[in-house]
């Protein structure tokens, strides 16, 4: 069976989030909007705020269209949350999962690729330093997922006391 769901059949919460999220991207600083997340072919790329927005919007679509009410209820119950709180958690996790792509090590990793090195130049042109500290230079690889986890952990500790 094929789906006949069209663009205009999207649940209203998905549409509302997409509209708010576009404004959120536009409100980010020049520096934040200079960070790249998906290099693509170098012409068609996504900035970090755009990628985080797209991730949240995709999660919203999955939450509202694909997950059944019984699955949402079961997950929410197991976590001690309401379904609305579960939705907020899912969207937050989706939107924050790649924050580690903003670290210097990640931003510099494509600098030697001629087709996309201009993305690194955009970061510097926005006034951000990409000079890596001793700790970063002594690490051969720093997966952005590990950096994301550290950023989220530190933020939760500083702002929420977790």
Predicted features and spans:
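Metal-dependent phosphohydrolase cores
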Residues: 1-162
């Amino acid at each position: 069976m094929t789906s006949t769901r069209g663009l205009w059949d999207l649940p209203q919460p998905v549409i509302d989030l997409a509209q708010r999220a576009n404004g959120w991207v536009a409100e980010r600083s020049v520096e934040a909007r200079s960070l790249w997340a998906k290099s693509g072919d170098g012409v068609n790329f996504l900035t970090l705020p755009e990628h985080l927005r797209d991730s949240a919007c995709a999660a919203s679509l999955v939450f509202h269209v694909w997950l059944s009410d019984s699955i949402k209820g079961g997950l929410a119950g197991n976590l001690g949350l309401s379904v609305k709180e579960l939705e907020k958690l899912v969207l937050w996790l989706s939107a924050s999962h790649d924050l580690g792509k903003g670290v210097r090590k990640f931003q510099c990793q494509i600098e030697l690729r001629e087709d996309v090195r201009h993305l690194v130049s955009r970061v510097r042109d926005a006034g951000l330093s990409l000079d890596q500290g001793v700790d970063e230079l002594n690490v051969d690889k720093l997966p952005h997922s590990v950096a994301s986890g550290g950023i989220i952990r530190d933020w939760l500790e500083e702002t929420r006391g977790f």
